[in-house]
Curated annotation (Swiss-Prot):
It is a single-pass type I membrane protein. The record marks 142-143 as: Cleavage of ectodomain. The chain crosses the membrane at residues 145-169. The keyword Iron-sulfur does not apply. O-glycosylated; contains both heparan sulfate and chondroitin sulfate. GO terms for molecular function: identical protein binding; PDZ domain binding. Cell surface proteoglycan which regulates dendritic arbor morphogenesis. The modification Phosphoserine is found at residues 115, 187. This is Syndecan-2. Residues 42-69, 88-129, 178-201 are annotated as: Disordered. Keywords: Differentiation, Glycoprotein, Heparan sulfate, Membrane, Neurogenesis, Phosphoprotein, Proteoglycan, Signal, Transmembrane, Transmembrane helix.
Length: 201
């Protein structure tokens, strides 16, 4: 019984020490260049210079072409649910105009103004990403792990109580002398001595 308590104590100490070690580590330990996730190698800033630069004189542009419009259905996703469900659909029209010769700064300003106007109109539509719950790095801060540990502890505690009660019951029975099951030991006369003649070939 003492061994069981020692093992239980050692197990709890190992869990607590693992929890403190997990809290001490940070995300900077995972990268070689000792910088945060945002500054880690492999993540480069977005270069928008190539988007607006083009070659050609632009003499062959068709200025009389009509504006093309496309419609796109964007689902509204509730951010509170764990599973994405499409509630309503909104119709968003986007006009595509032929390319015009403007400076990149003017084009960027217009796009920025359009995106701000869209955000003011309907902020719920601005993100179509599926909402996912971020799991914490520490194992014991997750609710499912914590529930499993508590359930395991309760079951182990009940099993320990059962073993203690069984031990007490057997000790009381032993004191009463009820372990005599009625089997008699055979007497020494029941065993006959075999002849000790040895034959040599």
């Amino acid at each position: 019984m003492q061994r069981a308590w020692i093992l239980l104590t050692l197990g709890l100490m190992a869990c607590v020490s693992a929890e403190t070690r997990a809290e001490l580590t940070s995300d900077k330990d995972m990268y070689l260049d000792s910088s945060s996730i945002e500054e880690a190698s492999g993540l480069y800033p977005i270069d928008d210079d190539d988007y607006s630069s083009a070659s050609g004189s632009g003499a062959y542009e068709d200025k009389g072409s009509p504006d093309l419009t496309t419609s796109q259905l964007i689902p509204r996703i509730s951010l509170t649910s764990a599973a994405p469900e499409v509630e309503t659909m909104t119709l968003k029209t986007q006009s595509i105009t032929p390319t015009q010769t403007e400076s990149p700064e003017e084009t960027d300003k217009k796009e920025f103004e359009i995106s701000e106007a869209e955000e003011k109109q309907d902020p719920a539509v601005k993100s179509t990403d599926v909402y996912t719950e971020k799991h914490s790095d520490n194992l014991f801060k997750r609710t499912e792990v914590l529930a499993a540990v508590i359930a395991g502890g309760v079951i182990g505690f009940l099993f320990a109580i059962f073993l203690i009660l069984l031990l007490v019951y057997r000790m009381r029975k032993k004191d009463e002398g009820s372990y005599d099951l009625g089997e008699r030991k055979p007497s020494s006369a029941a065993y006959q001595k075999a002849p000790t003649k040895e034959f040599y070939a």
